[in-house]
UniProtKB/Swiss-Prot annotation:
<dbReference type="GO" id="GO:0016790">
    <property type="term" value="F:thiolester hydrolase activity"/>
</dbReference>
<feature type="active site" description="Nucleophile">
    <location>
        <position position="105"/>
    </location>
</feature>
<dbReference type="GO" id="GO:0005576">
    <property type="term" value="C:extracellular region"/>
</dbReference>
<feature type="glycosylation site" description="N-linked (GlcNAc...) asparagine">
    <location>
        <position position="53"/>
    </location>
</feature>
<dbReference type="GO" id="GO:0008474">
    <property type="term" value="F:palmitoyl-(protein) hydrolase activity"/>
</dbReference>
<feature type="active site">
    <location>
        <position position="277"/>
    </location>
</feature>
<dbReference type="GO" id="GO:0098599">
    <property type="term" value="F:palmitoyl hydrolase activity"/>
</dbReference>
<dbReference type="GO" id="GO:0047617">
    <property type="term" value="F:fatty acyl-CoA hydrolase activity"/>
</dbReference>
<comment type="similarity">
    <text>Belongs to the palmitoyl-protein thioesterase family.</text>
</comment>
<keyword id="KW-1015">Disulfide bond</keyword>
<dbReference type="Pfam" id="PF02089">
    <property type="entry name" value="Palm_thioest"/>
</dbReference>
<feature type="glycosylation site" description="N-linked (GlcNAc...) asparagine">
    <location>
        <position position="184"/>
    </location>
</feature>
<keyword id="KW-0378">Hydrolase</keyword>
<feature type="active site">
    <location>
        <position position="222"/>
    </location>
</feature>
<dbReference type="GO" id="GO:0005764">
    <property type="term" value="C:lysosome"/>
</dbReference>
<feature type="signal peptide">
    <location>
        <begin position="1"/>
        <end position="28"/>
    </location>
</feature>
<feature type="disulfide bond">
    <location>
        <begin position="159"/>
        <end position="170"/>
    </location>
</feature>
Length: 296
């Protein structure tokens, strides 16, 4: 009886480092908060949840079930407020360790709204997955479904009105041929980018720069985000020639902290061909190559 005790103790001592390593691995993963896109819901992210659980077991992942499906057409500032109320307790529970934000499509703009308006957020890494960060200007199936009597060239007549700005898609509709109207009328993207005088611009920039890392993911075969380079903060000029992020006014003037983030090496950009818009969050190769390493 007494002879077996040293052996048991020896076995326990041998296993202890492995047990500690296993516990440490699950404890070191920051909580992940996922925000869905237009006409989406939490039900569409089962594959992503599986990928995270397989690669980082024990990670606390929350796919927020707010503004689902047609409710995702609600004005973006309203959605920002709703998501803020849901996210804040998760951030508080995470404490100093912080959280990661993984935001898809329209959700990427909602997350920017959160980041810029929350002075005490503790987001470590913001992953923007095929999100129109510089806006949208293109004839897509979504546009034809929502506004069947309009095309991209005349949608500004609806979007740049008080009624139009009650639709989320109009909040980031960025017509390069009517830029002046966009700047004056846009309720969301123009003030978020500080493209017009904004009384909160200094505070919003400071809040955004609390981020440690921003990851921008998009690709040429997306088929919805137009131009697709908007997912990388690129956009059309008045001739519909795409100018990359570094040639955008918001970067050159550092209106909300984009250039500052880039200068400190805090932005990583992935351009992935062969992925259509609705498959970004289900594509395992995208997860392995562009997302997994940032969720530690």
């Amino acid at each position: 009886m007494t002879a077996s005790r040293p052996k048991a103790l020896q076995t326990f001592c041998l296993l202890l480092p492995l047990l500690v390593w296993m516990v440490d691995r699950s404890l070191c993963y920051k909580p992940v908060i996922v925000v869905h896109g237009l006409f989406d819901s939490s039900a569409n992210f089962k594959n992503l949840l599986q990928y995270i659980n397989e690669s980082h077991p024990g990670t606390n992942v929350t796919v927020l079930d707010l503004f689902d499906n047609k409710e995702s057409l609600q004005p973006l500032w309203k959605q920002v407020q709703g998501f803020k109320e849901a996210i804040y307790p998760i951030m508080q529970n995470a404490g100093r360790d912080g959280v990661h934000l993984l935001c898809y499509s329209q959700g990427g703009l909602i997350c920017r709204g959160l980041l810029q308006t929350m002075p005490d957020h503790n987001v470590d890494t913001f992953i923007s997955l095929s999100s129109p960060q510089m806006g949208q200007y293109g004839d897509t199936d979504y546009l034809r479904y929502l506004f069947p009597t309009y095309v991209k060239s005349n949608l500004y007549r609806l979007c740049y009105t008080q009624m139009g700005q009650t639709f989320s898609i109009c909040n980031f509709w960025n017509d390069p041929h009517h830029h002046g109207i966009y700047v004056n009328v846009s309720d969301f993207l123009a003030p978020l980018n500080s493209e017009r005088p904004e009384p909160n611009a200094t505070d919003w920039k400071k809040n955004f720069l609390r981020l440690r890392k921003m990851v921008l993911i998009g690709g040429p075969d997306d088929g919805v985000i137009t131009p697709w380079e908007s997912s990388h903060f690129g956009f059309y000029d008045e001739n519909e020639t795409v100018l990359e992020m570094k040639y955008q006014m918001v970067y050159q003037d550092d209106t909300f902290g984009l250039r500052s983030m880039d200068y400190r090496g805090a932005i990583t950009v992935y351009g992935v061909p062969g992925v259509v818009h609705t498959m970004w969050h289900s594509n395992q190769t995208v997860f392995k190559n562009c997302i997994e390493k940032w969720l530690t």
